[in-house]
A protein has these predicted regions:
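Structured catalytic-domain cores with a bias toward divalent-metal coordination
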Residues: 2, 21-351
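Bacterial N-terminal signal peptides
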Residues: 5-16
Length: 351
């Protein structure tokens, strides 16, 4: 062997024996925010004016120093569901990009018009429910444009998505989550299920009725699922209050999920006993008037149990509302104003 060939061979051996360098994540841009590896950057997704006013969605991108999945956390889809919003502020402060594998995209308030307008369910600008207009429209009303922006800037750029909900300003709600398998991708359905357990939920509504057409996906997480991305909807909080146990529950759930995804170190103990609710019903008001609830969240009720009653604005004309099957009260509207067709309570049962 010639001296030159020997040198080439030794260099090849040395190169193959050297440890591979960890891949540095490329910068990620969400709206006006660009974060490079090891950075935490906050800013906005601008939603331009259209048929109505403009708005801007506050976001933070935490780009880990090491490669890993991209997890999107969305709070404030309904503006008065406040506990997840406060929780993501705490998550933002706690996240250290130097210790993170992957990226966390935090959508702090998905629905600023509703949050600052202090409205339940609907935007004060266009009267629409943001979680009923996905995947949105670039030329639609403000709620539709918000949904379009979140679909393009957040959902399409993420690997995993969590839509963090709570009881709205009028809803007294006990913690639960939704598992919504679409049946088209067993991998996604299974990962969605595991994400819920990793988050820490032990009471899970099983809903197999979600739309299967991406053009009319309706819901935030359903949009992600139809794009082949595991996504879950969690419910932790009630009545728009700054309830510390519910804020902590949201924060803890996020970090449990991040450990499960191996974005941060640590073990994830799964819930020991899980109840899957295959039967559920949202009872809706047959009339506009005043609601008098007689049950509380997490209360067990029998079939035919009196959940509350409606009267007119003078207190006359009582209409009783009863449970159509035995189960648990997942939430009950705890405030008097009631419009025809709006939710009164939700009941769930295993079968």
């Amino acid at each position: 062997m010639t001296r030159t060939a020997t040198i080439v061979l030794l260099l090849a051996i040395a190169t193959s024996a050297a440890p591979a360098r960890a891949q540095t994540p490329a910068p990620l841009t969400v709206g006006s925010v660009t974060a490079s590896a090891g950075e935490k950057v906050s800013g906005y997704i601008e939603v331009p004016a259209g048929v109505d006013s403009a708005t801007r969605i506050p976001v933070t991108v935490v780009r880990g120093a090491r490669a890993g999945p991209t997890l999107a956390l969305i709070a404030g889809t309904h503006g008065y569901e406040t506990q997840p919003i406060i929780a993501l502020q705490r998550v933002r402060r706690a996240l250290d990009p130097a210790a993170l594998a992957g990226t966390v995209v935090l959508v702090h308030i998905a629905n600023p018009p509703s949050y600052f307008g202090r409205t339940i369910y609907y935007s004060p600008v266009d009267g629409k429910n943001l979680n009923r207009v996905y995947p949105g429209r670039a030329d639609g009303t403000v709620s539709e444009r918000i949904a379009f922006a979140i679909t393009r800037e957040v959902i399409e750029k993420a690997d995993y998505i969590v839509d963090l909900h709570a009881g709205d300003g009028n809803e007294s709600l006990r913690p639960y989550a939704y598992w919504t398998p679409l049946g088209g991708d067993a991998r996604v359905d299974s990962l969605q299920r595991e994400m819920i357990l990793a988050f820490g939920h032990d009471l899970i509504v099983v809903d197999t009725t979600r739309p299967k057409d991406l053009a009319s996906s309706v819901y935030t997480t359903n949009t992600a699922l139809l794009l082949g991305k595991p996504a879950i909807t969690t419910e932790n909080g009630y009545l728009g209050e700054s309830a510390e146990p519910m804020i902590r529950r949201n924060v803890d759930g996020v970090f449990r999920l991040m450990r499960w995804l191996r974005m941060v170190p640590g073990a994830v103990p799964m819930p020991r006993r899980v109840t899957w609710l295959h039967r559920f019903e949202v009872l809706r008001s047959p009339e506009t008037g005043t609601w008098h609830p007689l049950v509380e969240r997490a209360q067990l009720v029998r079939e035919g149990a009196l959940l509350g009653y409606l009267t007119d604005v003078f207190g006359d004309g009582r209409t009783d509302i009863r449970a159509s099957f035995a189960g648990e009260v997942l939430y009950v509207v705890a405030t008097p104003p009631m419009s025809r067709g709006e939710p009164l309570a939700m009941i769930g049962a295993p079968r």
